Amino acid sequence: MTRRVNVGGVLIGGGAPVSVQSMTNTDSRDFEATITQIRALAENGCDIVRLAVHDEACVRTLRRLADESPVPLVADIHFNHKLAIGALENGVAKVRINPGNIGGEKNVRELADCLKTHHAPVRIGVNSGSLEKDVLNKYGGVTAEGMVESALTHARMLERCGFEDIVLSLKATDVRKTVEAYRLASRVCDYPLHVGVTEAGTPGMGNTKSAIGIGALLLDGIGDTVRVSLTGSPLPEPEAAIEILRALGLRAGVDVISCPTCSRTCIDVAGIAKRVQEATRQVKTPLRVAVMGCVVNGPGEAREADLGLAGSKTGGALFVKGGRAREVKGDLYEALMDEIRKRI
């Protein structure tokens, strides 16, 4: 089991539920735009939000952002450890750094002392595109072994400073390399792991890459917090991550299953299923709901769900806990939602 760290009240590692993260893409100096996006991400299910802190103007905005944010904030820092210290002094709950780009051991010690003072963890975020030159030369390019070595080298530097609240991430653009790196890290250390595929791309292919990479790791029991990285607005990211967790049984909620439809389909399966998903997006009650188009597979699939709707030429049939409950000839969606509302 991994170690446990506390990010502003959200626990990561040590058997805690897998949390969902995302990152703002607003100008962090613009309070109104940034807090609006943070709130929207939280509304979409995000547990922790990261934002880029690239100058002193960003730091000055952090106190108000941290005070008004509904979720803990993480400062993403590059090159200047003083910005990390300023961010911690202004209320962020965690800092993310890249290995090797905040200076030598003196700077690392100053950061470690500040992290201890504020009881905040740090993430050492290794990306395949920014590995140190000596690591690239040693391994002949980007490899899982090199990514893990980079992360552990800098984790040990922090531990020599007496600081151990460390999270690692080992993200590559290549799904196989990402999975290989996390599997290797899980064998050689007990740091909590933030998992994801970096620069996965636009929605669609990006979701697919993330689902394969994150899903493969979570099935292995690897991963304590996740981010689905998508090009464009970050608002779809939390939902995509939550869908992965729900598919693996790691997050409770309404699981809507529906048939792919064929010429036997008697009802608007896609329309009903989509409306049910939208209506139950925020529901935490574990419930499996089946929307099936006809009487061939419909009754059988519906019997495996808590609630099911199977279409027929005259309307549809509702199933509850595997048993045929009643025939429906009116609004099929509302009939199904009435049953759902009784159980949530």
What are these regions (language model features)?
Residues 18-24, 47-51, 73-77, 95-97, ...:
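Hydrophobic faces of well-ordered beta-strands that scaffold small-molecule active sites
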Residues 25, 30-31, 42-66, 96-104, ...:
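Glycine-rich, proline-tolerant flexible connector loops at the mouths of alpha/beta enzymes
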Residues 56-77, 110-122, 182-193, 276-280:
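Alpha-helix-loop-beta-strand connector modules within alpha/beta enzyme cores
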Residues 126-127, 135-284:
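Catalytic alpha/beta core domains of metabolic enzymes, predominantly
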